[in-house]
Amino acid sequence: MSKTKDQRTAKTLERTWDTLNHLLFISSCLYKLNLKSIAQITLSILAMIISTSLIIAAIIFIASANHKVTLTTAIIQDATSQIKNTTPTYLTQNPQLGISFSNLSETTSQPATTPALTTPSAESTPQSTTVKTKNTTTTQIQPSKPTTKQHQNKPPNKPNNHFHFEVFNFVPCSICSNNPTCWAICKRIPNKKPGKKTTTKPTKKPTIKTTKKDLKPQTTKPKEVLTTKPTEKPTINTTKTNIRTTLLTTNTTGNPEYTSQKETLHSTSPEGNPSPSQVYTTSEYPSQPPSPSNTTD
């Protein structure tokens, strides 16, 4: 009955929420139109009433939801308390070793009730307690232990295996203190790195040697340029002497009288070789005409 009431209240709240939203939309559209002042005032009042009703409906909806949450939490607490009461704390015994661990509250309460009911003798009490403990341990422990171990051990093993394969491949050797697995993986990582370095080293060396060989022929080329320069200088001097000889020949061929004077000048020199001053005078005079006084003498 309580569930049906909650469902009805929820449906009524949803319907009121939708109708109020539609009324707000319609009132806002009418307010935008150029109506009379009285109509605008009434629409604004309706909008205020609708907005307040929406707020009230939201509060009611939240309150009902909180009430449902409190009911569910109370039901869960009752269920957990019932489970704890129905499942007593039993003895956990290893059948191979015969070791038993139990809560002290139950072990003390059980032997206290047995001697009062059966006999006042002290010898019969320990036998009855031991029989009860053995019966309880054998019936309750064996079906419960394998179920808990099988469910707990299987799922954590899988992520641990993936974790070891993914992470320990990148562990440096400085972290490994005494773990043999860590040292085994750590030795594999540096073995791969120096192999790559050895392949890169020989490729760089021949490139340096080729650059040194290319620089040697460049030093020999400027030496050849220096040897060609002194050969050009005597050619310039020979051209100058040829120009002087051509001037002398042109001057002497034009005037036959100066040839005889030139011969006399050469003959006057004691050594037979003309002096530079005499040769220079003869080269200057060809442009001037001969005087008549020199010819008559």
From Swiss-Prot:
Keywords: Disulfide bond, Glycoprotein, Host cell membrane, Host membrane, Host-virus interaction, Membrane, Secreted, Transmembrane, Transmembrane helix, Viral attachment to host cell, Viral immunoevasion, Virion, Virus entry into host cell. Residues 107-139, 149-160, 233-253 have a biased composition (Low complexity). It comes from the Viruses. Glycans are attached at residues 70, 72, 80, 86-87, 92, 100, 103, 105, 113, 119, 135, 137-139, 144, 147, 199, 203, 219, 231, 235, 237, 251, 253, 269, 275, 282-283, 287, 294. GO terms for cellular component: extracellular region; host cell plasma membrane; membrane; virion membrane. Residues 254-286 have a biased composition (Polar residues). The record marks 65-66 as: Cleavage. Residues 190-207 have a biased composition (Basic residues). Residues 211-232 have a biased composition (Basic and acidic residues). It holds the Pfam family Glycoprotein_G. GO terms for biological process: symbiont entry into host cell; virion attachment to host cell. Residues 105-160, 190-297 are annotated as: Disordered. The chain crosses the membrane at residues 38-66. Disulfide bonds join 173-186, 176-182. Residues 67-297 are extracellular. Belongs to the pneumoviruses glycoprotein G family. This is Major surface glycoprotein G. It comes from Human respiratory syncytial virus A (strain rsb6614).
